[in-house]
Amino acid sequence: MQVIETLAEGLKRELKVVIPADEMQTRMNERLADVKDRVRINGFRPGKVPVAHLKKVYGKSIMAELVNEIVRDKPTEILTSRGEKSATQPEVAMTEDEAEADKILKAEADFEFTLAYEIIPAIELKDATGIKVTREVVEIAEDEVNEQILRIAESARTYESKKGKAANGDRVTIDYLGKVDGVAFDGGKDEDAELVLGSNRFIPGFEEQLVGVKAGDEKTITVTFPADYPAANLAGKEATFDITVKDVAAAAPIEINDELATKLGLESADKLKEIVRGQIESQYGSVTRQKVKRQLLDQLDELYQFETPERLVNAEFENIWRQINTDLEQAGKTFADEDTTEEEARAEYRKLAERRVRLGLVLSEIGEKAGVQVSDDEMQRSLFEQLRQFPGQEKQILDYFKNTPGAAASLRAPLFEEKVVDHLLSEVAVTDKTVSKDELMAEDEAEDKPAKKAPAKKKAAAKAEAGEGEEAAAPKKKAPAKKKAADDSAE
């Protein structure tokens, strides 16, 4: 086999691989010898079929198998021998001339193919001890814990039917039918819907008009959907709702005690407080982690500047661009609405894609040199988390990870990255700084000052800058529920 380098520009490589016809013939003969005793051909005793006849019957199919095996296995072998790592799967090109291909299958012509790929650049690791990051820490006040417990208690409170008029804080049970221009619309009907007046779950003006109703009342109210309502056919439209009040119930007093904790499956109010405090700490800890990681990656980005594989950047950019356009479409906006142009946005997100790829390669190299490993147990926990997020789809998810090339790597990658970040944080200077909740949740100054206003969901695309995403964009208030158009989907 002969390997000839025909292109070496930057990270791009192209190789011509030539396997002589006589070598292909030898391989085919070896394969024919292996099958000679196993094949059954009419007119011949087992093991007595002449090689020439075997070649006539099976030669081309065996040669096709050999070609496929060579194309499958040789690229890795060749790159390993050259001390190179391909950024993506090498592109293999063979002759498209049928006559030439037929000669190859008959071992009458050399088998030639080309490999086109980009190498992963050699990365010389730099001293990271000069990196300094600030870890913002929030001291959780007792009042905040109590407020959260109060919200939990409110969500778990009971209601008792009452006679008389509904007031704010009461729960009404209603049937309703929504109409625009006298015609019922999709999602505008529900039965036995429970609504706490004053909760602002429904669109503006809906709940206010139910104050004062009694069980058995029938009433038609008129409301106007917000101009930015996600359902375009309803946005800004005036609608009527025919309402039948089936029950009015008053809320029982809120009591935060062991009985409440027992209802929630806990042994005591103290345990409830402990869990709530832990949840708040976890929420703030997640934001702290994101901001520390962003600082770390920003400084790594300044330390490392090298050419990135174009194919990796293209693939990353396409992922970002697809998400950006999806977010714009869902928001009903254009690039012009965000004070930018498509061309400018493409340039911005192209830079982001390059940064993602570059930092990914750097973290990979650091992790490899540091011996960072992702254990089977960690992979299993990650898989179980995926299953937990999609109840009822466990089999499909398991099949996907079992049968899809690269699926397991998609589970491993974020785990590996977080462990590399942990490794780096153990080496760099980390200074704790006590801040308020508002200070912790504030956007980074750098993100508040883009060259131009970023397109919709800039933060969504910027997630890889910190590995973990910043806080998700707030849901649209008064979004239509799948079943109840009047209901706020963010309930």
UniProtKB/Swiss-Prot annotation:
EC number: 5.2.1.8
Disulfide bonds: none
The UniProt record lists the keyword Manganese: no
Job of this protein: Involved in protein export. Acts as a chaperone by maintaining the newly synthesized protein in an open conformation. Functions as a peptidyl-prolyl cis-trans isomerase.
Organism, as annotated: Sinorhizobium fredii (strain NBRC 101917 / NGR234)
Compartments it resides in: Cytoplasm
Description of its domains: Consists of 3 domains; the N-terminus binds the ribosome, the middle domain has PPIase activity, while the C-terminus has intrinsic chaperone activity on its own.
Protein name (database record): Trigger factor
